[in-house]
Swiss-Prot record:
This is GDSL esterase/lipase At5g45920. Belongs to the 'GDSL' lipolytic enzyme family. Pfam families: Lipase_GDSL. InterPro entries: GDSL, Iah1-like, SGNH_hydro_sf. Its EC number is 3.1.1.-. The active site is at S12, D189, H192. Coiled coil: none annotated. It is an enzyme of class 3 (hydrolase). It comes from the Eukaryota. CDD domains: Isoamyl_acetate_hydrolase_like.
Amino acid sequence: MMRRKIFLFGDSITEESFSDGGWGASLADLLRRKADMVLRGYSGYNTRWALKVVERVFPVAEEDGGDSPAAVTVFFGANDACLPERCSGFQHVPLHEYKQNLRSIVSFLKNRWPQTAIILITPPPIDEEARLRYPYIENTTGLPERTNEVAGLYAKACIAVAEECQISVTDLWSKMQQIPNWQTECLWDGLHLSRVGNKVVFEEVAKKLKEEGIGAEDLAVDLPLIEDVDPKDPLKSFDEF
């Protein structure tokens, strides 16, 4: 049996997910020998740019569907929600276009792999004070390039698209704000995830995968475990697996 694949498609929060304590690395550990995490994270990207490159990001489907991934996570919105009149305005995507871009990405994935589970993840909350302390480009306005209120609008839009498309969604924006002192507990720079924030994403995505029948208990290992190897005839165990 070939090991299943799970694609992680998103912006920098996905690109960094294989770092120490990252949510992608934790998923890889949870499903080791059962599913491979395929990282497709692109720092700074919004849904407009993601839609532009989506055909280059994912492999062409085989005719028999045998290469279909078990799941794809789609995690965009933090950059779309940049305010258009502020220092990162070039990353901004209007809310109505954000929703349409998400629909188009979901439609692309459904057409390519009809049996693949798709999980949307909302943008995280924003700590505006920290964004002023950790700007990524010159910011002379004294105003944050993102606000938590606007991030919440994009989170709600993401949830609406998931409901419309009848797919799973993780409401990260709401979930993180349930944690005391989330601004410093879940985020290290007002946007990107701390170790605690990564743990939240990992647990929420693992929960959604389980609901889709892609949990650690649901997937088989791809070759015999050491305890399944017959000490008297080791090679026979591989023939019978």
